[in-house]
Amino acid sequence: MIDSDESFTLVDTRPEDSYEGWRIHGAENVPFDPHDEFGDEKTERIEAASNGDSIVAICGKGLTSTPFGFELEQRGYDDVAVVKGGMEDWSKVYEVVPVETANEDLVVLQLQRRAKGCLGYVVGSTAAESAVVVDPTRQTDQFKIAAEEAGLAIERVLDTHVHADHISGGRKLASELDVPYHLGERASERGVEYDYEPLVDGETIALGDVEIETLQTPGHTTEMVNYLVDGEALLTGDTLFVESVGRTELQFGDEDAANGAELLYESLHDTVLELPDETRILPGHVSVTADNRYEVGSPGELIGARLGDLRDDLELLGLDEDEFVDRIVENDPEKPPNYERVIEINTGTEPPDDESEATELELGPNNCAA
């Protein structure tokens, strides 16, 4: 309904602070507790917001929006629907976007986790009928389905780094398929406590005639790597976005963020910006506003850019090193919710208690850009 021309009013029944922190664009906030009286004030707010449209109610998990819908029906509203799983299910909605490639044998699919702006990839060879998955999220079935529909068998799973904003699905997917799981060789320095196959700088993975080269790009994290796909696309993880660059204090801490910024500057200028202008940059995230809009582009459209365009348009890439470091350190965006706990999970030092905790930890947008 959100992407159609159908007219309706979306009512978010969560408390105001939850609504302000993360919501769907266009939603009207009418906080509701089933134990409280449904007074005239709520009715008036709904009448003002709906303007006669059908009403769709949403909450965190469907627990308050369902009785809210019953209350509306008792008051004469006959066109009321409820989002069954609430914002929790909204956080699991994906778009699959094909990437145009010069090599007809090369397949690149961008999987967009719409509510969080997480971007993962299926990269494969049509001739070899094989693929790797890069930066998968916990909803691993989405990646398996995308690969299967493209006629590709997943042979390996790769992460660009230890993520701080969401729980990686990398190990889970590799285990489900009994295939190798890879991180950059410096992941051991982050205290990673599970088995993985390290990729060294310059190491290449072949899928038939398609080659994926590992490039060390420390900065956002020390173990960060980018993956150069057949010389035409760079999967940048949290090194370079289409609207910014990666922040550095999530691993290094506020006191040592300058060290991370220096590493990031070197990675950008000595590695990423040394590539041809025609290289397509495919990032690991797109920033999402509190009301669930992409900072650049739109859901279902490719999030990416020519490196040459970013070189010209992204001010941060034109700064000298001192200016760059100062800008990164001075800029202090809100940290991702629960990022320290998420890092514990992604290094394997402290697994989630259960699926419920994992879901709660991931609610809300990502905040990995500087």
List where the protein language model places each region:
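Active-site HxH/HxHxD metal-binding segment of metal-dependent hydrolases
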Residues: 128-131, 136-216
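Flexible, polar/low-complexity N-terminal or interdomain linker segments that lie immediately upstream
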Residues: 1-21, 91-119, 328-369
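Conserved beta-strand hairpin/beta-sheet module of binuclear metal-dependent hydrolase folds
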Residues: 99-150, 227-237, 242-243
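Accessory terminal helices/loops
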Residues: 18, 70-78, 269-280, 287-370
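An active-site-proximal "capping" alpha-helix that borders the catalytic cofactor pocket
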Residues: 252-283
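Positively charged, proline/Ser/Thr-rich regional signature most characteristic
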Residues: 1-55
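Active-site environment of divalent metal-dependent phosphoester hydrolases
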Residues: 64, 141, 162-167, 188-191, ...
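Catalytic cysteine-centered active loop of the rhodanese-like fold, especially the PTP/DSP P-loop
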Residues: 30, 41-88
